[in-house]
């Protein structure tokens, strides 16, 4: 698990040395917080529009609700697996894997006009599983992008940006649907 015995000084890792030497500019921190804000816009509100998308395409409401429930189950499973993946593969590779799953789910949502139940279920699973990183990844990113001394401050900044993004960007899917004439 990466735990160290109490009282034994562990040698500083390469990552910690690099982070101690690195003093990101305000521009880099601003861009990083903007990225967290945008990610939260997807993670905090994006899932709620999955049902609306498929129902607006004429899919059965009960089957769409089942797909949404499946998305929730995949999200819970992904949250349980996310930490283990980060420990086993490293957070860098786990980010690629989980975001790849999320992007695949989004890509399958684009195929909603085909009215395929299999594609709807697959999109729900990939969105849910990949979306786990969007919801629990903030603390992982804060740990990777800060030193132990700065972790709490970095996490607080990231969580603030995440919360702000969820509030500020929550209207976007509906506004885009209004402008585009529908969700699909």
Regions found by a protein language model. Name each.
Residues 63, 69-75, 79, 86-141:
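C-terminal transmembrane helical hairpin of 12-TM major facilitator-type secondary transporters
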Residues 49-58, 141-145, 175-176:
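Membrane-interface helix caps of multi-pass secondary transporters
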Residues 54-55, 85-86, 173-181:
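Interfacial helix-cap and linker-helix signal at transmembrane-aqueous boundaries
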Residues 1-14:
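C-terminal membrane-cytosol helix-exit motif in multi-pass small-molecule transporters
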Residues 61-62, 148-158:
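Loop-to-transmembrane helix entry/capping segments in MFS-fold secondary transporters
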Residues 142-152, 181:
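Paired intracellular helix-loop junctions of major facilitator superfamily
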Residues 25-84, 169:
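Extracytoplasmic gate region of multi-pass secondary transporters
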Residues 68, 72, 99, 155-163:
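Small-residue-rich transmembrane alpha-helices and their cytosolic helix-loop interfaces
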């Amino acid at each position: 698990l990466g735990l160290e015995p109490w009282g034994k000084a562990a040698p500083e890792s390469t990552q910690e040395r690099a982070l101690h030497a690195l003093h990101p500019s305000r521009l880099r921190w601003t861009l990083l917080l903007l990225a967290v804000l945008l990610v939260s816009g997807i993670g905090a509100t994006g899932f709620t529009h999955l049902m609306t998308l498929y129902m607006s395409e004429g899919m059965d409401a009960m089957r769409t609700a089942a797909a949404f429930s499946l998305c929730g189950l995949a999200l819970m499973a992904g949250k349980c697996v996310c930490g283990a993946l980060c420990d086993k593969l490293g957070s860098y590779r786990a980010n690629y894997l989980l975001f790849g799953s999320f992007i695949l789910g989004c890509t399958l949502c684009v195929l909603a006009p085909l009215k395929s139940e299999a594609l709807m279920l697959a999109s729900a699973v990939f969105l849910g599983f990949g979306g786990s990183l969007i919801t629990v990844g903030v603390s992982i990113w804060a740990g990777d992008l800060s030193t132990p001394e700065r972790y709490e401050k970095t996490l607080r900044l990231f969580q603030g940006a995440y919360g702000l993004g969820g509030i500020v960007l929550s209207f976007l899917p509906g506004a885009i649907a209004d402008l585009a004439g529908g969700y699909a």
